[in-house]
Amino acid sequence: MSKAKCIMVQGTMSGAGKSLLCAALCRIFAQDGYRVAPFKSQNMALNSFVTRDGAEMGRAQVVQAQAAGVEPDVRMNPILLKPSSDVGSQVIVNGRARGQMSASDYFKMKRSLIPDILEAYNSLAAENDIIVIEGAGSPAEINLKADDIVNMGLAKLVDAPVLLAGDIDRGGVFAQLYGTVELLEADERARIKGLIINKFRGDVEILRPGLAMLEEKTHLPVVGVVPYLRVEIEDEDSLSDRLGTRPAVKPLDLAILRLPHVSNFTDFIPLEQHPLLGVRYVQSTRQLGTPDLVILPGTKNTMDDLRWLRQSGLEAAVLKLAAGGTPVLGVCGGYQMLGETLSDPHGEESGTPCTLQGLGLLPISTVFTPEKHLTQTKAVASAGSFAGAKLTGYEIHAGCTEVRGKAFCTLADGTPEGCVQGSVFGTYLHGLFDTGELTEKLTVFLCRAKGIDPAGASLIPMEQYRQQQFDLLADGVRAALDMDAVYAAMGLAAAKGECL
């Protein structure tokens, strides 16, 4: 069986747009008839996903797999680092947690994971025509180069040609690209087959003199100037933008608490796309105000974030709103916080054994355990105004929760899940709004409470919308890149089955 061709996208910095460029290439190659899979050897992210077989992987490669039209597979992201503090992360290898590690301890051992990386990559390469590889940060981090397993170090391992992207929207893109190239070794520079100017706004003709000078100084071609594309596609790099405080300019005001260790904020992207729902992320009582719904999202460190909630005054503010009838929703870690007690007998969350009082809004108690619960889930909401909504999601949590109240939903096997008390709702399900049914029922529920007519505000199905956005992304990138040069870098022609 022949091995797949590959192309790698590296960037001059974090946030250069590597993830979306890779998603675009996945879509383009799939449109051109190739079997495509994304790959990133090591991803650091708080947003993760559970595959069909219960393995945990980064959401960036999930999005890229969706763009390629294939099911997410943990082989696409064999190493996932989930930060739990400023100096440590949970290390997940092949979808399974290996435990917490400090940054220094991880750097000492990460090269031992090369066999896992190569096994995952080679397995994917045997099943596909093209592998689209995403780098991380910058290949010019000279203090990290010796043990690199995600940028040029990986490119050497799999013999990948590289496209280097710079973000012009932040300014200084010529210095970014030239400086990065100059800091690379000669054999690394030889791997770069083209430079990409990403996120450009304006008249490209103004750039022409700079592009010519950049090509002259680097001896590398600029293979595209990609415009700033306004597409609604989940992007790890958009975290800071999405978590920025924005006033609600839509009829309904939804306030999501910006927890210090917030995770899987992507759960709420479908809400942002609804014409009646204004979504804000807040981190103070002043910002909270009097919303129509308060949401406590997932978190990588429930105990620390509960302490922060208490110290910031947001706990008292949420309790006051709830007492006045404002609906409150908790997801995963946020659900645990809404309960009566949270016990960490082994120090899994806190580092040391402890028990904390929760907000007391739901009759539940949670005990954290070393084992992580990972599963894809189908359910039907059974609570009040949400009853009958079909849910498709996944669970990622360490802890067992005892529920002494009414369930939020019923799983496909008949098991009750989550909890409801009055206008307070909690669930472990991530992705609960993706099908659209719960979003519509939530919107009607909130509209009625506020005296707003919800008629005519329904959305197209989330999956249909997602596919439209992937096509828009691919169209924009295809028009901007010299795709003949990209295919030539891989030794392929644009039409499937042709080789150069």
Place the predicted regions along the sequence by residue.
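Extracellular/periplasmic helix-exit of transmembrane alpha-helices
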Residues: G339-G347, G351
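Conserved P-loop NTPase catalytic core
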Residues: E348-T375
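Flexible phosphate-sensing "switch/lid" loops adjacent to ATP/NTP-binding sites
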Residues: M1-K320, P327, D344-G347, P370-E371, ...
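Gly/Ala-rich beta-loop-alpha elbow adjacent to hydrolase catalytic centers
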Residues: G330, G334
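Short active-site segment of divalent metal-dependent hydrolases/proteases
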Residues: Y335-Q336, F433
